């Protein structure tokens, strides 16, 4: 059975949440968001280790019950996501790595299964994604509609995103060297010439970004427990 390492970048501040602490440490029920996320990842038998990347002034993570879990390793991040992920990759020993947002606590085992199965299909990697359903508009700088964008081949990129470890590290390093803005790991791989596979995932794998997302994530977690 192939095994994977998960890298969870958790060094961000989450300013859009307008909270007094980083959003990953806000509570959903009796656990913080990041605890829900890590619990879901730890439950998968093919994930042998999780590397959690935190800010150098983080004083929250060490107080969590999961902080001393034998399959969790902590390392320090940087001023942007790509640097944090690259730092996390230095602790990965498996051939393949999954990178997952700390603020996506609703990831399911079935989505993890589907993504990992894609590792058998090639060396370009794969990401979870959902097809765009809404009508998409492109705006000008004044937020006026310029055109309607054909949605037939548009997808919302989610996480985890899964790639061969060394290829991803090289791609991120190259992007940072060229001062390219890397909004996710797939964008680094794309610029390096790879064509990652889109694996259709569940639309309830939401990222908690704004205050209103907290209630939605709590509801999704409750509903998933009933499945």
From Swiss-Prot:
The record marks 151, 207 as: Positions MEP for the nucleophilic attack. The record marks 16, 23 as: Transition state stabilizer. One of its GO terms (molecular function) is 2-C-methyl-D-erythritol 4-phosphate cytidylyltransferase activity. Pathway: Isoprenoid biosynthesis; isopentenyl diphosphate biosynthesis via DXP pathway; isopentenyl diphosphate from 1-deoxy-D-xylulose 5-phosphate: step 2/6. Pfam families: IspD (PF01128). It catalyses: 2-C-methyl-D-erythritol 4-phosphate + CTP + H(+) = 4-CDP-2-C-methyl-D-erythritol + diphosphate. InterPro entries: IspD, IspD/TarI, IspD/TarI_cytidylyltransf_bact, ISPD_synthase_CS, Nucleotide-diphossugar_trans. Its EC number is 2.7.7.60. Keywords: Isoprene biosynthesis, Nucleotidyltransferase, Transferase. PANTHER family: 2-C-METHYL-D-ERYTHRITOL 4-PHOSPHATE CYTIDYLYLTRANSFERASE, CHLOROPLASTIC. Belongs to the IspD/TarI cytidylyltransferase family. IspD subfamily. Catalyzes the formation of 4-diphosphocytidyl-2-C-methyl-D-erythritol from CTP and 2-C-methyl-D-erythritol 4-phosphate (MEP). This is 2-C-methyl-D-erythritol 4-phosphate cytidylyltransferase. It comes from Tolumonas auensis (strain DSM 9187 / NBRC 110442 / TA 4).
